[in-house]
C-alpha cells in the first residue's frame, strides 16, 4: 500500500501519556515508513502515538503490548468508551484513591474489565510522569480526556489489539508485505517499564527475531554503544537523530536526547516517491533528502 508524507489530516492525539511515548518523534518515525506495505504491526504499543498519527488506510493494523492492564484499557476504549467515561467521571484526584486503585491492580483483584481499565487510566493520569507508581499531586480534570477517548475509540475500530510477547507476535504476523514498528524498552531503562520481567528485557532476543523476518521493520532506541553493536549487521540501517528531552527541559532549556532509528530497508524511499512533502515546512525535497542521507550510517 502506498503512503504519502503528510501532517495533520487524519492524525489524532493519543488519549494518554506513557513512559517513552513517541509524541515528540512521531513525525520523524512516520516519515521513514516504507513506501509499500499491507500489514502494519505496532509491536510495543504504549500510548500509540505513532498509530494515532498514522492515517488510517486499507492496510491490516495490529496494536500489541505485553502489559495486560494496558491492553484491557485499549479494548475498553474501543468497545465500551461510554461505560469507561462513566467510570472515570467521578474519580477523585487524591493520594488515598490513587493508592487504593494501585493496590487493587497489583493484587490482581477480580474486577470488571471497564472498572479495571478506569483504575489503570486514572493511575496513568494521576501519577508522576505517567509511571503509575507515584502519585503526581498535580491538578487534572479527568473529563478533559473524554474527547480524546472518543477519538481513539473511532480510530481503533478496525485495529486488532493483541497482548503477546514481542517475539511470538513478530513470528505470528510476519509476511513479505508486513511492516513492524518497534519501540521496545530502552537499554538500561528497565526500571521505568511496568511489564518488564525481573530478568530485564531481552534485547538480543528481539534482534534475532527481527533479523529473520520476511517483512520490514523500523525500530526506535536510545543511542548507546550496546545497541549500536547489536545492530551492526549487513543490510541494517542505523540512523542517529535527536529530540528535545522533556524531563531535562526543566533544568536545561533546549537539552537534546539522542536516539536511534534502525531499519532493514532504505528509510528515504517514501520521501523520494513524494511529489509534495508536507511534513517539512521550510525544506524542499532535495534539501530533505540531503539532510537525511547526511546522517545515515550504512
Residue ranges and their predicted role:
Residues 1-60, 66, 169-178, 189-298:
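Class I S-adenosyl-L-methionine
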Residues 2-25, 31, 35, 78-192, ...:
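SAM-dependent nucleic-acid methyltransferase catalytic core
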Residues 71:
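Short alpha-helix immediately C-terminal to the canonical SAM-binding loop
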Residues 74:
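Conserved SAM-binding loop
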Amino acid at each position: 500500500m502506498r503512503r504519502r508524507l503528510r501532517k495533520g489530516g487524519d492524525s489524532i492525539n493519543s488519549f494518554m501519556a506513557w513512559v517513552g511515548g513517541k509524541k515528540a518523534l512521531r513525525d520523524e518515525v512516520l516519515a521513514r515508513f516504507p513506501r509499500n506495505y499491507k500489514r502494519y504491526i505496532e509491536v510495543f504499543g504504549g500510548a500509540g502515538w505513532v498509530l494515532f498519527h498514522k492515517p488510517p488506510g486499507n492496510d491490516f493494523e495490529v496494536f500489541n503490548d505485553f502489559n495486560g492492564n494496558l491492553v484491557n484499557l485499549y479494548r475498553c476504549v474501543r468497545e465500551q468508551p461510554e461505560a469507561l467515561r462513566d467510570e472515570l467521571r467521578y474519580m477523585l484526584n487524591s493520594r488515598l484513591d490513587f493508592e487504593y486503585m494501585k493496590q487493587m491492580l497489583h493484587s490482581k483483584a477480580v474486577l470488571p474489565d471497564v472498572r479495571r481499565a478506569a483504575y489503570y487510566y486514572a493511575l496513568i493520569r494521576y501519577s508522576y510522569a505517567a509511571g503509575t507508581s507515584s502519585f503526581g499531586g498535580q491538578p487534572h480534570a479527568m473529563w478533559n480526556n473524554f474527547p480524546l477517548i472518543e477519538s481513539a475509540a473511532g480510530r481503533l475500530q478496525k485495529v486488532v489489539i493483541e497482548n503477546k510477547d514481542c517475539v511470538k507476535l513478530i513470528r505470528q504476523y510476519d509476511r513479505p508485505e508486513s511492516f513492524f514498528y518497534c519501540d521496545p524498552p530502552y537499554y538500561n531503562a528497565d526500571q521505568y517499564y511496568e511489564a518488564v520481567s525481573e530478568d530485564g528485557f531481552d534485547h538480543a532476543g528481539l534482534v534475532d527475531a527481527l533479523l529473520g523476518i520476511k517483512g520490514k521493520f523500523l525500530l526506535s532506541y536510545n543511542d548507546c554503544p550496546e545497541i549500536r553493536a547489536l545492530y551492526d549487521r549487513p543490510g541494517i540501517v542505523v540512523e542517529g537523530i535527536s529530540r528535545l528531552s522533556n524531563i531535562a527541559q526543566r533544568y536545561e532549556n533546549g537539552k537534546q536526547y539522542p536516539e536511534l532509528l534502525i531499519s532493514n530497508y532504505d528509510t528515504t524511499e517514501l520521501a523520494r516517491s513524494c511529489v509534495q512533502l508536507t511534513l517539512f515546512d521550510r525544506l524542499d525535497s532535495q534539501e530533505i533528502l540531503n539532510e537525511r542521507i547526511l546522517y545515515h550510517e550504512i
